[in-house]
Amino acid sequence: MLQTTANLKALLLKKSVRTGTFTLASGKQSDLYIDCRVTAMDPFGAAMIGDLGWHAVRSKIHSEKLSIQAIGGMTLGADPISLAIGMASARQNPDEALQVFTVRKEPKGHGAGKQIEGNFAPGQNVIVVDDVITTGGSTLKAIDAIEREGGHVKFAIVLVDREEGGRQAIEARGIHVIPLFTRGTLLD
């Protein structure tokens, strides 16, 4: 896993990390922009995210003896990460395969008016996913939507924690956050 971590870090630095002046989704100004979608939608990046993510998720599930049925988060950032981890779970441990879902920013205005799409059912224990957390706002919105629909969020996994308070905001809700990288580990 160490080589996979190093390779994923190199790909994130090459494809996803930009310096300059940026306005983040949280509205905050930053000198660093991390667009994980570019790496997560690269086939090699997705494979590494899937393997590392599944390793981290499976370790947590087994150490705490959790029963988890599905994984997902707020579209669009969480989608390729959730799918990569779900695919890795099915490939590596078929008996523990995680179903995948996505959370819309708002409920659909037509049809069934659903906010959660894919393989999700009320009463399930799930993992919430995000690509990058800054304030934790997007992740908390996804958690709120999942809980409104009857899901039970057991923990969160994030590709990069910018270390700007988001992890603490999510954990204040009693939901542990597993970052694959932090700003510090990514940039060191």
Question: PLM features: residue spans?
Answer:
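Active-site catalytic pocket residues across diverse enzymes, especially alpha/beta-hydrolases
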Residues: 61, 89, 93, 150
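Short, glycine/charge-rich flexible loops or terminal/linker lids adjacent to PRPP-binding catalytic cores
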Residues: 82-127, 137-140
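Acidic, divalent-metal-coordinating active-site segment for phosphoryl/phosphodiester hydrolysis
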Residues: 132-143, 166
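Short glycine-rich phosphate-binding loop at a beta-alpha junction
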Residues: 64-77, 157
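PRPP-dependent phosphoribosyltransferase catalytic core
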Residues: 2-11, 144-188
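Phosphate/pyrophosphate-binding loops at sites that engage ATP/ADP/AMP, CoA/4′-phosphopantetheine
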Residues: 53-68, 143, 147-149
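Active-site-facing substrate-recognition patch
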Residues: 1-63
